[in-house]
Structure formats: C-alpha cells, structure tokens
C-alpha cells in the first residue's frame, strides 16, 4: 500500500511540472532546450510524498523566472523542517509577486524566510500597522501618570512649606505670659541706665558737701546707737529669768505626769475593785482598828 501511494504521488507531481512547462512555453515563448529543469535532480521519489501536502498552495508560474523560484523553493525545503506555516508564507509571497509583476521577483526570492527579523527590517510596513493608535494610547497613559506624579509632588511641596510657615509663626510668636515678662524686662532694662545715671550724679555731687559733720548730726547718731543697744538688751533675756522659766516648765511637766498617773490608777481600780491594791493609808487605819479591838476591857 505504501509503495503504490508513493508511486501515484510521484506521477502526480510529474504531471504538475509538465503542465507548468507547457504554460511557460505557450505564454512567454519559453523553450525547454534553453533552460532545462529536471525534477529528479532536485527531489528524490521518497521525498515527493511530503511535498504533495503543500504542493496545492503553489500558484501557476508565469515567466522565465518561475523555474528559478521553484528551485529555490525546493532548496529551502530542508531548512524549513517541514513547517507548513513557513511553506504557506513562501507560497503567498510567490503568488503576490506573480500578481504584481516580475520586477520585485528577485528581491522577494532572496529573502530569508527563517529569519523573521530580517523580513521585518526590509518591510517595516507590515510591522508598523496600528502603531500610531498604540502610540497615542501610550502617550496618554504617560501624560496621565506624569500629571499624577506632578500633582503628588506639588502637594508634598505645599504641605511642608505650610507646616514650616506654621512652625516659624509659632516660634516667632511667644505665648502671652512670656511676652508680658519680656516687656517688663525690656522696661527694666530701659530703666537701669537711668538709675545708674542718677547714682553717678549723686556720687559726683557728694564731694560738694562739706567734709566735716555738724554737731547736731553727731548727737543724733549717738542717740540712735544708744537706743539700738537698749532694744537689743531688752530683747535678749537674762540668765536668771531663763533658769526660772526652765524650773517652772519642769514643775508643770511633773504635775501633768502625776495627774495622768492618778487618773489611770483610779480608772483601773474602778474597773477591777477586787484586785485593787491597798494604799498605806488604808493599812494604817486597819491596824488602828485592830489595836482597839484587842484591848483588855475591865470586868464589871
């Protein structure tokens, strides 16, 4: 079954190539003797079956450059590693080139299909589709982001400035009580030079008085000294008076202690009458009564 299928595929590919040759000779005047092309030289019979799956993508070739493009196609087949997407791209480019004309055939045929970056570098129009719209969106996003950042920075700058102004105002404006104190201090400082100036004037005027004192002034000074001595002697107590006061205070303390002792003992006696101690006075009275009872009475 596999051998029959491969042989049938091989015959089909040969028929396709013969039809392409006939179309070339009929349309452009191409003669096979000038540019011979043998499919056996390029593709072996075993590999023809793999090419059949993608052979229907190939457009009808027109012009003398068709054989060269087919040769390049089969040479690139091994490099594409049986990738159907790459093969479809190649067939689409060939069909587009046939529709447009053969002027750009060589440029498209020389493209490297494996390197997608080279394709995009040579034809940037396919890569730059819809880029203005994307760029506009990106620019808008960047503008909004920058606006937000500027707003945040402006707020952050405004807040510290306001706080700094408030701090400066608070530092510059002292509380009312400190302001009053500073005002009084300022007034006192202003009064100090005046007071010093008056003292200096008095000192300067003092030598103008006569150096000798009057007799009346001397008498007044001596009287004042005597009165001060009397008051000091009256205020300072004498030693006799001090000893008398000490004795009276000691006697007062003794009387207070005696009174407290009697009060305590009397209270204890009232609370415990059976255990109350007998005083010496009571003992003496009892003895006297006992002596009287023991006397010998005369007989009648």
UniProtKB/Swiss-Prot annotation:
Organism superkingdom: Eukaryota
Region feature (Disordered): 167-186, 224-244
Polar residues bias locations: 224-236
Stated name of the protein: Uncharacterized protein C12orf71 homolog
